Amino acid sequence: MRRSDPYMDRARELCLAAGVDPDSRVGEGRGQPAWCSYRDAARKEHLAREANAAASEIANLRPQEARFQNAPLKIFGVHDEATVAQMRNCMAVGNVVSGVICADGHLGYAQPVGGVIAYEKQISISGVGFDIGCGNMAARLDTRFDDIAGIVPTIIRDVAKTISFGIGRANAERAEHELFDDSDAWRESDMEAYRQKAVSQLGTVGSGNHYVDLMRDEEGFVWIGVHFGSRGLGHTSATRYLKAAGGKDGMNVPPAVVDEDSELGRRYIAAMQLAGRYAYAGREWVVERVRQLIGGNVTESVHNHHNYAWRETHAGRDLWVVRKGATPAFPGQKGFVGGSMGDDAVILEGVDSPEAKASLYSTVHGAGRLFGRKEAKRRFSRAEMDCWLNERGVTLIGADLDESPMAYRRLPDVLAQHAGTVRVLHTLRPFAVAMAGEGEFDPWKD
């Protein structure tokens, strides 16, 4: 690893304390320096210090009303201390009614990914995050996999040529949409100046964990799956309103919470809703273009945000429910949840149960990371990633090691932690994946 690694010095100290030479080599072949085995412990120490500092800063903010203190937190699955501490810090600010950590949860910017918080008459700009309206869409075709199996490499190459992946990309085709004619929405959100750039970016996918997947279900029908959000529009909106609210950008920082009826709150909600509509339009555009490449007709579609704030009623109370990397799952509501790259995905549906109520009718949005992006690149090789995909018959275009399937939990294990809150309707097995190429950093991903 480069010497710029922020955890190297402490990892070397821990290695020496254990009586091990930090520069000795471990593992097969040349292996890696022994201190790398202590990097995770050094990182956890650092995050714990950050969480404690954030808690001290929060304690000096405007005191939380007594009726919102110690709100219940429902935790699905097992999480590291840093993730839980980050969530508790978030819940110590504002009119918090309850919170949830889903089983795929992990540290995020200000609020954990997989974290859900219900507010009374308030909304968290930090909680919604920078990729406003990031979500998934899946569409089932009347085309069977067996009918296209011989031309899958050609189809996925055409997808990569037709759809724009990566950062700062404009669409090769002009994407028309009625959203761009809604002048009131652009004015009320104070995002009018971004409208033309948003036109050029509609339907661009970005990088990181954003993708276009081709999958087949139990009956052999083809599904198109996409995952991305509102691109530069959402990032610009979030940055602008986070600054206006006096919020900070970082992992362990107090969340920026605003009143729904304040001028700032009203404008932010308008901007969030605009970005949400934009994200929906972009995913629909990509699915339709991919459908045209494959052929066939859509017989079913499932579409959901997982970075957003919804106005909902829970236990008779009207609340803002902020989901950051969590899928809404009300009884009978369908959701598309992807696994890791090349892993099975599911179409699921919420059920009514005490556990589901406690979850604020929320479930996972993916498998959830085991290792951060830098750690994944250090641990895994391209050969290992390619072998994993080849064994499962997945054709891949693009992607980097930070998205290695080995860096993620397995989706069935994660869903098992939410038993009794959702049921799986379809299991979708991918056969082709298109993502941005190596080295693309995406500030707009979730």
Please state what every model-predicted region is:
Residues I125-A185:
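A generic, well-ordered mixed alpha/beta core segment in the N-terminal half of proteins
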Residues R30-S37, H177-S183, V433-E440:
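Amphipathic alpha-helical surface "interface" segments used
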Residues R2-A55:
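Amphipathic alpha-helical segments in structured regions that serve as interaction surfaces
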Residues D21, G29, V113, L141-F145, ...:
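Residue-level detector of alpha-helical segments with a strong bias toward transmembrane helices
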Residues S56-A85, G94-V100, Y109-V113, I117, ...:
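Domain-length cofactor-binding catalytic modules of enzymes
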